[in-house]
Amino acid sequence: MNQKVVFLDVDGTIVNDKGIIPESTKIAIRKAVENGHKLVVCSGRSLFQLPQMLLNLGFSGMVTAAGAQVIADGKEIYHAVIDEEHRKFSVDYMEKNNFVYCFQTDAGVVMNKRSEQQILNIMSDMGITEEHLRQLVGEFFIQEDVWNNEKEEKLIYYDAPFGVARVHADLEPYFDVVALSLSGADDYCGEVGINGIHKATGMKRYLEYVGIPREDSIAIGDGPNDLQMMDYAGIGIAMGNAKEEVKKRADMVTSHIDEEGLYRALDRLGLLN
């Protein structure tokens, strides 16, 4: 078997909705690595939001912030950030329409005081505790001039007055907007990134760097922001807990994350033999 590169989403694929990595998932990742395959985190999370328990599993690389940063063999090979003009533009839009929002940087999450309290309330309503939220998003930086950070990679919003399609139409062509990939999120929560930068472009940059063809890549995910990743890969796999639209686009559907979903997928592909 050729060496494979397996790109793994984090939330709902590696880490369950309780913030736990199932033991079967840990075993699967370690076995695949021992068998000579490259496993790469491919997440909407920024690098600082990846817990140490995940980093300890032996990943060969990271595609973070939905493609805005790519790390291979321990070094950064790509990093895109939102320019000042569009940081200001997006903040003006969010404030004018009373969105609850924050920016992700490579060091923490930036938000104003108004959004901080409302995000805590929204997460509580979704069944996510403040402790789990801080595991998900990392450190909070509170500042009123939210746009004033040159390391801002993407924007997350909640409780919007209209759906993702409308927000996308309002913010293009510079930005691309997809539904937020988080258990309990609805069409009024989204991820805003630079148009043309997404998980699949991060995969492409990683594969070109390591010299492995696209047909030897596998992508596994569960949310709308995983669709481009799964379409780009040689094989796209949906978790059993994935949204229905994701399952329909997948080449294969495995079981739920808490029912050995990742282990069964990699085993079925022969990566654990």
Regions found by a protein language model. Give the residues of each.
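Asp-based phosphoryl-transfer active-site loop
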Residues: Q3-G19
